[in-house]
């Protein structure tokens, strides 16, 4: 089992997204995504997302809000559980991310991006302020 986090940072009607184009053999290459990654030993979901967002963007988020849990059975040969957060409070300046190009995308344009098919489902739920608990098969 793999535990991971995902965060969508909000500012002025926009969401910070990363266009994955930097890593070799990245399963997410060419897709837009939120920020996040795998847990380190002993971390809580909140500690993990705060660390991952900082490493990938240079932003220090405060008070991330848990808005869902996604389950990906047998993804890359393993069961993944992904804690999904949003955040609106942060400090810092964007860095040149090791994951890809960071960009503030207007919320009304997000569903037009090249996202994973499943992202369309939970992005709509998040925009409506709903809590999401869903199994997704890729």
Regions found by a protein language model. Name each.
Residues 58-92:
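Active-site segment of metal-dependent pyrophosphate-handling enzymes
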Residues 84-86, 95-126:
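NUDIX/MutT-family hydrolases
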Residues 125-138:
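Charged phosphate-binding loop/patch that engages nucleotide di/tri-phosphates or the phosphate backbone
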Residues 10-14, 23, 88-93, 129-130:
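Short, charged/polar surface micro-motifs in flexible loops or helix N-caps
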Residues 27-29, 77-79, 96-98:
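Short glycine/proline-enriched turns and hinge-like loops at secondary-structure junctions
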Residues 1-17, 38:
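Conserved N-terminal beta-strand and adjoining loop/helix that marks the start
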Residues 15-51, 55, 138:
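Conserved Nudix-box catalytic region and its N-terminal flanking loop in Nudix hydrolases
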């Amino acid at each position: 089992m793999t535990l991971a986090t995902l965060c969508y940072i909000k500012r002025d009607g926009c969401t910070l997204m990363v266009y994955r184009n930097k890593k070799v053999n990245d399963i997410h290459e060419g897709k837009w995504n939120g920020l996040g990654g795998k847990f380190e030993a002993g971390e809580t979901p909140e500690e993990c997302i705060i660390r991952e967002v900082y490493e990938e963007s240079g932003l220090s988020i405060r008070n991330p809000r848990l808005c869902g849990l996604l389950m990906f059975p047998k993804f890359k040969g393993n069961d993944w559980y992904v804690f999904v957060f949003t955040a609106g409070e942060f400090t810092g300046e964007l860095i040149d991310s090791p994951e890809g190009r960071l960009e503030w995308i207007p919320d009304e344009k997000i569903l037009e991006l090249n996202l994973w098919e499943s992202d369309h489902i939970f992005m709509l739920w998040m925009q409506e302020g709903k809590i999401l608990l869903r199994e997704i098969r890729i």
